[in-house]
A protein has these predicted regions:
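Extracellular/periplasmic helix-loop-helix junction of adjacent transmembrane segments
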Residues: 31-61
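Core transmembrane helices of Major Facilitator Superfamily
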Residues: 29, 111-123, 338-350
Length: 426
């Protein structure tokens, strides 16, 4: 008798190729990003400077998101993804020769993020075309886990690689960038083996590419604004991205000040628990859905994020006692693990609801629209919160974020979670 049954999604060769490409591309992308953040943190000790780098990564979504989605829906997705892979490989290599110049690093970040704007919706829109509806939720869980997990994995391996080749301030800073370029090559080769994707093309008016592009974009805006089963999942995914952005720019300083650890230690102390939390979240998701349903599980997860922010803000008070630092480190590890579980509950379910309730002809545009909204919503709050943490109080900032999140969830919970989110419709 077979003890372990291989999930059907892992028998889908087309999905495995796309998944493998995503893994190598995302790990390389995040490995570069975290290496730059470490360099900036080492040179400046300023969350505000790090926030400027984060803004350079998010702003291209607003600029290119207007055209990325329509283009994804109108052209060969495989060809488009191969071109983007090639461009990213060159940009990752350029990081290795940029030194510590903030201006050059921001320019490369802007260009790499601009290219990625075409890759992300292409991948997301391709999944429903190569995976049956019966296993679509499995594909989304694995794909989104890789998207989130690659952030953590990139962060985990960045510090040890830098230390292995000499540490910050030495030539070891180049090693992660060179490795990222190698990852892109592997991802490119994998993607080349993907069969031609038969996409359902949208109807477009006659005229220039600009006329077609903006027609399709505004058609998508109409769908999002009129369909709450599309708009609310988008809000949930924006919430996840916003919190990832905030933590990425302020948590390094939190580790340095209150956990009293070197910046390179954050990978093992916090990122490992986070990735185990992501794995646990994926493993438990079906049981959580069965017991609590979509609405209640998402509601509780968002509330949990707010509580974790509040706890992180209060923890530094323990530093006054002899065992305070040990307790802060312990609770921070637990918080990282729980955060991984909560992110999976919100993001995987939000993504599944979004795909199942949006028109297949709009998949590329819907996820591109999500990128645009993330670009509009996240940079200003991240910059303001980073500035507040830098100039006023880092613990106080976490407390404020926690109270704010909890308040919004309690006030708006019945209005949104009770009336909109339900089981996805076919």
């Amino acid at each position: 008798m077979r003890i372990f049954k291989i999930p059907l999604i892992l028998k889908n060769q087309q999905f495995l190729i796309l998944w493998g490409n995503q893994l190598f591309m995302q790990v390389g992308f995040n490995l570069c990003n975290y290496t730059v953040l470490l360099i900036l943190a080492d040179r400046t000790h300023s969350p505000f400077v790090q926030a400027q780098f984060f803004a350079a990564l998010t702003l291209p979504a607003f600029i290119f998101g207007l055209i990325a989605g329509p283009i994804v829906d109108m052209v060969s997705r495989k060809s488009l993804m191969l071109v983007v892979d090639f461009i990213l490989g060159i940009l990752f290599l350029m990081y290795a020769f940029a030194g510590s110049s903030l201006f050059i690093l921001i320019i490369i970040a802007f260009l790499s993020s601009s290219a990625a704007r075409f890759l992300i919706p292409s991948q997301a829109a391709t999944i429903p075309l190569i995976v049956g509806k019966g296993i679509l939720s499995q594909a989304n869980a694995l794909f989104l886990f890789t998207l989130m997990g690659s952030v953590v994995l990139g962060y985990i391996i960045a510090s040890p690689i830098i230390e292995l080749f000499g540490g910050l301030g030495t030539g070891g800073e180049r090693a992660p960038f060179l490795l990222s370029s190698a990852f892109v090559i592997i991802g490119f080769v994998l993607l080349a083996g993907l069969k031609k994707i038969k996409a359902v093309m949208p109807e477009v008016p006659k005229g220039t590419i600009f006329k077609k592009t903006f027609h399709l974009f505004w058609q998508t805006v109409g769908e999002v604004t009129s369909n709450q089963k599309v708009s609310l999942p988008i809000l949930l995914l924006i919430f996840v991205e916003l919190n990832i952005g905030i933590l990425s720019v302020v948590f390094l300083e939190y580790v340095r000040r209150y956990l009293r650890l070197p910046l390179t230690a954050v990978s093992m102390v916090l990122m490992m628990p986070l990735i185990f939390g992501l794995i646990s979240g994926v493993a438990m998701l079906s049981k959580i859905q069965g017991r609590f349903g979509y609405r209640r599980s998402i509601y509780m997860a968002v509330l949990g994020i707010g509580l974790l922010f509040f706890v992180l803000g209060v923890l530094p008070v323990l530093g006054r006692w002899d065992l305070g630092i040990v307790l802060i480190r312990f609770f921070s590890v637990i918080a990282a693990f729980v955060t991984g579980i909560l992110v999976v509950i919100i993001a995987v379910q939000g993504r599944t609801i979004l795909q199942m309730n949006s028109d297949i002809k709009m998949q590329g545009r819907i996820f591109s629209f999500l990128d645009v909204m993330i670009a509009i919503v996240t940079p200003v709050p991240v910059l303001l919160i980073a500035l507040t943490a830098d100039r006023i109080s880092l613990p106080g900032t976490f407390v404020f974020m926690g109270i704010g999140t909890i308040t919004v969830v309690i006030i708006g919970g019945k209005m949104f979670f009770g009336r909109v989110i339900g089981k996805p419709t076919n």
